[in-house]
């Protein structure tokens, strides 16, 4: 999707806030624990290369979802370790070796395909994934995991790490988390030997279960100033949101009582009023279920009226504002604020889905 640089709709990214958040986390984690920044999905919509470049000197490595995201970082000049968290196609192994990118091994079936490929494995570095209860990818028992380690080592592959992922570390009820932790520790205890890097802590674990941190952590949503639990658990220390979503009024009109607004005529003015139009819609990530939510204009909350269109939304204004008046979708205006968590609660989802859904059509503008 082409970035629309000539519209007033922009995602403003405060890189210094991300830097601050990482330093806050580091201050509350053991000094000898490696800190890996999770920058998958374009750094949760914040811009992978820009974010990674800015924080490169305060993290030990980066985590991404796939080979293309990893190559984007390499092409952007990042040379620290990169771990692909997902399962990669066998065909990308040469690319991973060539670009010093670490792959995840999650099953013996994948390893069978790797061995059958007859590819050169010299220089390949891997981490093994344990499914301790998340239910997506990974080894579920000690025996196949140990077999994978043995076969990889015989093939000359460097087994650098082993990891798992917690499903409920961001919830008030820690029972499922404790089950997963016990499962992971039990499997580790049965292995013949452990690789150098053991990691299980995501953002939520790093915040609320610091006593379970091993020797590396994967820091994702929290570095962008997003509470992993939404509003369920209180953050133990100050974190700054890094992204604001803004635009401007491009059209203002006065309508009479009984006038309809938008597709389906779902909004009818109950009295004479001012309606403002803003060039941002569901193609930009502001989904149709946001009808009835507010935007901020001149420090006031203005409701979205009528259906959200692909490229535009309409809002009810308290007075007639001039064209070019700033509009805030996520961020602050005067004493009012709207957070990604507020948006998520309206949608019935999570705050990091909100920022990930801001499409490439919206330019990212960087501060600091």
Curated annotation (Swiss-Prot):
Residues the record lists as N6-(pyridoxal phosphate)lysine modifications: 40
GO cellular component: cytosol
Cofactor(s), names only, from the UniProt record: pyridoxal 5'-phosphate
Catalytic class of the enzyme: isomerase
Any one GO BP annotation for this protein: D-alanine biosynthetic process
Record-linked PROSITE patterns: ALANINE_RACEMASE (PS00395)
Official protein name in the record: Alanine racemase
Organism (species): Streptococcus gordonii (strain Challis / ATCC 35105 / BCRC 15272 / CH1 / DL1 / V288)
């Amino acid at each position: 999707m082409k970035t629309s640089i000539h519209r007033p709709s922009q995602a403003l990214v405060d890189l210094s806030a991300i830097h601050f958040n990482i330093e806050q986390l580091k201050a509350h984690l053991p000094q000898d624990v490696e800190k890996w920044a999770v920058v998958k999905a374009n750094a949760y919509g914040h811009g992978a290369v820009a974010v990674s470049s800015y924080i490169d000197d305060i993290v030990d490595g980066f985590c991404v979802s796939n080979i293309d995201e990893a190559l984007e970082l390499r092409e952007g000049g990042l040379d620290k370790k990169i771990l692909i968290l997902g399962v990669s196609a066998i065909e990308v192994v040469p690319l991973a070796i060539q670009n010093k990118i670490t792959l995840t091994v999650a099953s013996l079936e994948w390893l069978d395909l790797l061995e059958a490929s007859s590819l050169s494995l010299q220089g390949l570095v891997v981490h093994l994934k344990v499914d301790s209860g998340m239910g997506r990818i990974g080894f579920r028992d000690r025996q196949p995991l140990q077999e994978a380690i043995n076969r990889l080592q015989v093939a000359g592959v460097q087994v650098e790490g082993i990891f798992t992922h917690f499903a409920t570390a961001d919830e008030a009820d820690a029972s499922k988390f404790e089950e997963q932790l016990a499962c992971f520790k039990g499997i580790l205890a049965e292995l013949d030997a452990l690789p150098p890097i053991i990691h299980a802590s995501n953002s939520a674990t790093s915040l609320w279960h610091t006593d379970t941190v091993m020797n590396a952590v994967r820091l994702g949503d929290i570095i962008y100033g997003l509470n992993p639990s939404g509003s369920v658990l209180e953050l133990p220390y100050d974190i700054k949101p890094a992204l604001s979503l803004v635009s401007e009024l491009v059209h203002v009109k006065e309508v009479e009582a009984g006038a309809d607004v938008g597709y389906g005529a779902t909004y009818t003015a109950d009295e004479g009023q001012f309606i403002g139009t803003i060039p941002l819609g569901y193609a930009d990530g502001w989904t149709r279920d946001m009808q009835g939510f507010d935007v901020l204009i001149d420090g006031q909350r203005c409701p979205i009226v009528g259906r959200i269109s692909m490229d535009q939304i309409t809002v009810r204004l308290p007075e007639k504002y001039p064209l070019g008046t700033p509009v805030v979708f996520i961020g602050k205006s005067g004493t009012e604020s709207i957070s990604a968590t507020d948006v998520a609660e309206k949608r019935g989802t999570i705050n990091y889905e909100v920022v990930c859904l801001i499409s490439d059509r919206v330019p990212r503008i960087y501060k600091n």
